[in-house]
A protein has these predicted regions:
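Glycine-rich beta-alpha junction loops
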Residues: 17-19, 93-94, 159-165, 209-211, ...
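Gly-rich Lys/Arg/Thr-decorated short loops/hinges at beta-loop-alpha junctions or inter-strand turns
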Residues: 25-32, 100, 118-123, 167-178, ...
């Protein structure tokens, strides 16, 4: 629990149980942590995920063993697919009564024992069962590092009951340190992008959720203010630059995309896509995607962009570091005629569209796009809103 505090965690979401008796006691004793108990493990796991997204930091979910742990698996999958750094900590039977440790080919040693690590290995960045109490510091160091580094995602630590109650001397524990070489932005890549944007008649920035994960919103805003290049965004990147800015044209894609954003995308001749995996929901038929554009992708995940060839050039870099370097380059301001054309599309194909709002009012109905627009005007910038997936994916962007 102390290590979670050191990582900046303030809240732990949980459903207690006999498999985490000692962990729950440790949580209660750690005054810097606030425990939030939910009615169900799925609620705790999704709360931890939402917490991580809201704070752009670590979320923590604590659950017991067996079906208590499997109740959190759906949220782990969601965190894996949405790049959310959540630490899942599950309780477990005594070490020598677990199939994971003994390797005995039986289904279970008894009530509530299950090999959760095998279940979650394919949907986490790191999953481990602790075998020795003295390894806890190193395993926590590694898990926390991996959750927050590179393309973020969930990690899972399974703690047997007897090891939870083991006596250790924290100062004497072995710690883990990465030997990974920090990712560097290549000057040649930055220069090539600056030249491409400057030469283009119709340049466009395509921003994804990776902008937020990298903490790059401010440097992106600085760059756009300087270059006046129109911006479109994926539904996951709606807050990467901000839809209310004058150069923000709209969301793109078949789900949640705007007509203005898609028009800009299809007419651009140079696209710099940053922090997006260019999913098929966004590109549609890749042979018809942005047919006039030279596409450069900057992303933290190399593997994601090996699945299909959507980009002409891929740059492996952190979004914030890349934009900080690009901001210092002499990028020519975008062609004013092109910028005004994009702004014109945004104005003509506004969201919500006025004729639809009027027709809904005549039928005494509520237009969801209009509702979203008004709600956004009334809420504080840091307000939290709980909605279903359709509203968040289709209406809000």
């Amino acid at each position: 629990m102390r290590r979670l505090c050191e990582a900046g965690v303030g809240h732990v979401f949980l459903v207690t149980g006999r498999g985490i008796l000692f962990l729950t006691d440790a949580l209660a004793r750690e005054k810097a942590l606030t425990s939030v108990s939910t009615y169900h493990e799925q609620g705790a796991s999704y709360a931890a995920m939402a917490y991580a997204q809201a704070k752009n930091s670590l979320g923590v979910c604590l659950v017991s063993t067996g079906c208590a742990a499997t109740n959190a698996v759906t949220a782990a999958l969601c965190a894996w697919q949405d790049n959310v750094p959540v630490v899942f900590i599950s309780g477990q039977h005594m070490l020598h009564e677990t199939t994971h440790y003994t390797k005995h080919p039986i289904r279970t040693y008894g009530s509530q024992e299950a090999d959760i690590i095998k279940v979650v290995q394919s949907i986490t960045k790191y999953a481990v069962m602790l075998h020795r109490a003295e390894d806890i510091a190193a395993e926590m160091d590694k898990a926390l590092y991996l959750a927050m580094t590179g393309r973020r995602g969930p990690v899972w630590i399974d703690l047997p009951l007897d090891l939870q109650n083991a006596r250790i001397e924290p100062e004497q524990l072995t710690r883990w340190m990465t030997n990974a070489v920090p990712l560097q932005v290549r000057a040649a890549d930055v220069c090539a992008v600056a030249e491409g944007l400057s030469r283009a008649a119709r340049p466009l920035l395509l921003l994804g959720g990776g902008i937020r994960s990298a903490g790059a919103q401010q440097v992106v805003s600085d760059f756009v203010d300087k270059s006046r290049i129109p911006v479109v965004f994926t539904p996951a990147g709606a807050d990467a630059y901000g839809a209310s800015h004058v150069y923000s044209i709209g969301a793109v894609g078949s789900i949640g995309g705007s007509r203005a954003g898609n028009f800009a995308l299809q007419h651009a001749d140079y696209i710099l896509a940053v922090g997006t995996k260019l999913s098929s929901q966004m590109t549609g038929n890749r042979t018809l995607f942005a047919p006039h554009a030279c596409i450069t992708v900057v992303d933290i995940d190399v593997l994601e962009h090996q699945k299909e060839e959507a980009a002409h050039k891929f740059i492996h870099a952190d979004a914030r570091a890349f934009f900080e370097a690009l901001r210092e380059e002499a990028v020519h301001p975008a062609n004013e005629e092109w910028t005004m054309q994009c702004i014109h599309w945004k104005r003509v194909f506004s969201v919500p569209e006025e004729d639809f709002v009027q027709k809904a009012a005549q039928r005494n109905e509520i237009d969801l796009y209009a509702f979203s627009y008004v709600l956004g005007k009334e809420l504080a910038d840091d307000a939290a809103v709980i909605t279903d997936a359709g509203f968040e994916e289709l209406i809000v962007p």
